[in-house]
Amino acid sequence: MLDLKFIRKHPEAVRMALEKRGAEFDLDRLLDLDDEWRQKLFTVERLKNRRNAVSEEIARLKKAGEPAEELIAEMRNVSQQIRELDGEIRQVEENLQALLLQVPNIPHPLVPFGRADTDNEEVRRWGEPPAFGFEPRPHWELGEELNILDFARGGKVSGARFSFCRGAGARLERALICFMLDLHVDRHGYTELFPPFLVNAQSMTGTGQLPKFAADMYKVENEDYYLVPTAEVPVTNYLRDEILDGDTLPRKYAAYSACFRAEAGAAGRDTRGLIRQHQFNKVELVKFTRPEDSEDELEKLVRDAEEVLRLLRLPYRVVLLCTGDLGFSSSRTYDLEVWMPGQGVYREISSCSNFTDFQARRANIRYRAHPRAKADFVHTLNGSGLAVGRTLAAVLENFQQADGTVTVPEVLRPYMGGMERITRK
């Protein structure tokens, strides 16, 4: 959430940011409501001052034995006006808050202008796409022939965009989760959390999923519960409504969770394979930092996610998202895209974002630089470290062999009981 004082003071900067994003939002309506709210507050304060003055005058007249009926009548009238205005102020505040929750974050000055993902800027590449002496196949074909992915039974049990991992496929999924968590905890210094998979609406609002993306979420009927779309939600809200000791920053958390997304806008896209499922696993990295450190911490976050791909020997590229492709809550985002030879494209496997104080304002997460300092909002960051299903798909496609088997990356073999090759069983 943006600071209302900032919007009030810099309306044209906010308007320009909305235009760069291609966001449709009635900023004038918000500014008008803000004016109305402040005018009503001024009026009610003036009435309260008058009520206090009349009350003192009534007390003086009564003490002197003089009549005070006219002032008592005025007192009743003023009190009634205050009650009515207080109700109007509450309604205006609710409407104003609802609008504030719909304003996206301000893009960082380094974010390139653009309307779609085709305008994103490539920053760097790592690794060479493997050269095959045969036509590489997509992971869904490899997985089904090796009997380690079962999309048909996933559809039977749950519906479209669900699947089973089986045998070595299930073990590979588990190996990837453990490998990622061990790397981030042991080498990168994150504290591991295992979060709830159900959160309340306040948590979803705190990270920016609600109210804007309600259609993409799975809600438990007649309950204040949502299935998490990412561990970012519970882990960020882990510190909601808290004031942190500045000496403990940055705080870094790594968490595995299953993720659940309705994919309401994805009809017809990526209908095969593991790329766009309603349920998938992900290891998430979340940071809480001082404002002056957040940009440096973003670069470190990207490097932490990159190391997963490098250790797996998976070719990838890093792209800086343009204004039109930037997430609602993000100020700046890097995407990591892994090479998928069976599809001949780079596919997103991680998004690493700096949200500045946008989420912290919504979730009321603050810190004190020293014990007597004023509490200020932290900056929050998060990134996928990585999306597990997409990583599994990338391993199958990049390590496939001419005979249809798949070589297990060396760093995963200790997690696979020493298995070096996945064959059909």
Curated annotation (Swiss-Prot):
Cited Pfam families: Seryl_tRNA_N, tRNA-synt_2b
PROSITE patterns, sorted: AA_TRNA_LIGASE_II
Catalytic activities: tRNA(Ser) + L-serine + ATP = L-seryl-tRNA(Ser) + AMP + diphosphate + H(+); tRNA(Sec) + L-serine + ATP = L-seryl-tRNA(Sec) + AMP + diphosphate + H(+)
Enzyme Commission number(s) of this protein: 6.1.1.11
Enzyme class: ligase
Any Gene Ontology biological process: seryl-tRNA aminoacylation
Positions that bind ATP: R261, A262, E263, E348, I349, S350, S351
Sites where the protein binds L-serine: T230, A231, E232, E284, S384
Gene Ontology CC, one term: cytoplasm
Annotated compartments: Cytoplasm
UniProt xrefs under CDD domains: SerRS_core
Pathway(s) the chain acts in: Aminoacyl-tRNA biosynthesis; selenocysteinyl-tRNA(Sec) biosynthesis; L-seryl-tRNA(Sec) from L-serine and tRNA(Sec): step 1/1
GO molecular function list: ATP binding; catalytic activity, acting on a protein; serine-tRNA ligase activity; transferase activity
Keywords annotated in UniProt: Aminoacyl-tRNA synthetase, ATP-binding, Cytoplasm, Ligase, Nucleotide-binding, Protein biosynthesis
Keyword Protein biosynthesis: yes
Complex and partners: Homodimer. The tRNA molecule binds across the dimer.
Described purpose of this protein according to its UniProt entry: Catalyzes the attachment of serine to tRNA(Ser). Is also able to aminoacylate tRNA(Sec) with serine, to form the misacylated tRNA L-seryl-tRNA(Sec), which will be further converted into selenocysteinyl-tRNA(Sec).
Similarity field: Belongs to the class-II aminoacyl-tRNA synthetase family. Type-1 seryl-tRNA synthetase subfamily.
Domain statement: Consists of two distinct domains, a catalytic core and a N-terminal extension that is involved in tRNA binding.
Protein's name in the database: Serine--tRNA ligase
Organism: Desulforudis audaxviator (strain MP104C)
Gene (UniProt): serS
